[in-house]
């Protein structure tokens, strides 16, 4: 990872648009290498604006952002941050191959003629192999499924060889197999020292692979280790009435001996389940995945849904 200290440092950042709308206000947090962090918030909470600010596309009116201890302009020149979009606003009928799209990740290393060198071709090949799309290299990207396109954009980011990777809703429009493959890759990248910031509304997946969480609603509501931060109290503050909120008691569950209280917060994709110790106790701030089709409590959950 070169000699840079891989980090994201956001200090007292405020962004206002020309119409007077304040997208983010006094936002402060920091992240270091070897981390997968979930950026969690409702639509309109400032997630996209924060990503644009980190990428240098939006300039804050107040505060400062540094990447690897460098101002954004210098960090971008050094290819220190890569971005994996939720989708690309392009004409999918335009004839461009998967190989060419992944090669775009090498543009920052080329001169204005953009003639790839041997090292560029090598890194593109390695990136495609890592996300298992080498067999798609000569396909037109417009022919691919949503999940395949997502892997192409991820390969492009890998080809860029950036220590910081931003991913915007990487699990939207992908099947379970692709989601699991993406999670496995992100965990490998974390072990290699990358810093990965993932914007997501798929709450049920967060405890699976994210060791840090930044929860926002135009400002930082909570930030820290997942086990300390990703809890019922903070989720209710961040999401308010957006999520369904179901509270069950042990006697309503399949196991008659299980008298723990259960609180379910769900956006109807994957639920986050909080367990109390007894039916009298409030739910403890621990999490477990619960997909309605797989959860042992699914009957009780479905019967109690609003």
UniProtKB/Swiss-Prot annotation:
Listed GO MF terms: ATP binding; ATP hydrolysis activity; ATPase-coupled transmembrane transporter activity
InterPro entries: AAA+_ATPase (IPR003593), ABC_transporter-like_ATP-bd (IPR003439), ABC_transporter-like_CS (IPR017871), Metal_Ion_Import_ABC (IPR050153), P-loop_NTPase (IPR027417)
Cellular localization per UniProt: Cell inner membrane
Binding site residues for ATP: 41-48
Membrane topology: Peripheral membrane protein
Gene Ontology biological-process annotations: iron ion transport
GO CC annotation: ATP-binding cassette (ABC) transporter complex
Family from the record: Belongs to the ABC transporter superfamily.
Protein name per UniProt: Probable iron transport system ATP-binding protein HI_0361
Originating organism: Haemophilus influenzae (strain ATCC 51907 / DSM 11121 / KW20 / Rd)
Upper classification of the organism: Bacteria, Pseudomonadati, Pseudomonadota, Gammaproteobacteria, Pasteurellales
């Amino acid at each position: 990872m070169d000699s840079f200290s891989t980090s994201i440092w956001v200090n007292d950042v405020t962004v206002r648009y020309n119409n007077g709308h304040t997208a983010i206000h006094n936002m402060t947090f920091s992240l270091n290498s070897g981390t997968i962090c979930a950026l969690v918030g409702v639509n309109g909470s400032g997630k996209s604006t924060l990503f644009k600010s980190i990428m240098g596309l939006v300039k804050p009116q107040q505060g400062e952002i540094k990447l690897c201890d460098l101002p954004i302009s210098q960090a971008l020149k050094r290819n220190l941050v890569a971005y994996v979009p939720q989708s690309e606003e392009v004409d999918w009928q335009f004839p461009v191959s998967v190989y060419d799209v992944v090669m775009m990740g090498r543009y920052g290393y080329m001169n204005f003629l953009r003639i790839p060198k041997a090292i560029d071709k090598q890194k593109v090949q390695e990136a495609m192999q890592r996300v298992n799309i080498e067999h798609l290299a000569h396909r037109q990207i417009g022919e691919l499924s949503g999940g395949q396109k997502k892997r192409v954009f991820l390969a492009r980011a890998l080809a860029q060889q950036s220590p910081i990777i931003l991913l915007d809703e990487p699990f939207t429009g992908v099947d379970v197999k692709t989601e699991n493959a993406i999670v496995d890759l992100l965990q490998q990248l974390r072990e290699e020292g990358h810093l990965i910031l993932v914007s997501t509304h798929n709450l049920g997946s967060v405890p699976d692979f994210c060791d840090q969480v930044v929860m926002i609603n135009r400002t930082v509501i909570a930030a820290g280790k997942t086990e300390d931060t990703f809890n019922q109290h903070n989720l209710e503050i961040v999401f308010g009435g957006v999520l369904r909120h179901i509270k069950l008691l042990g006697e309503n569950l399949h196991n008659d001996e299980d008298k723990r209280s259960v609180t379910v917060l769900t956006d109807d994709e994957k639920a986050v389940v909080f367990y109390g110790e007894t039916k009298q106790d409030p739910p403890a701030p621990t999490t477990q995945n619960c997909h309605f089709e797989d959860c042992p409590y699914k009957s009780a959950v479905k019967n109690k849904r609003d």
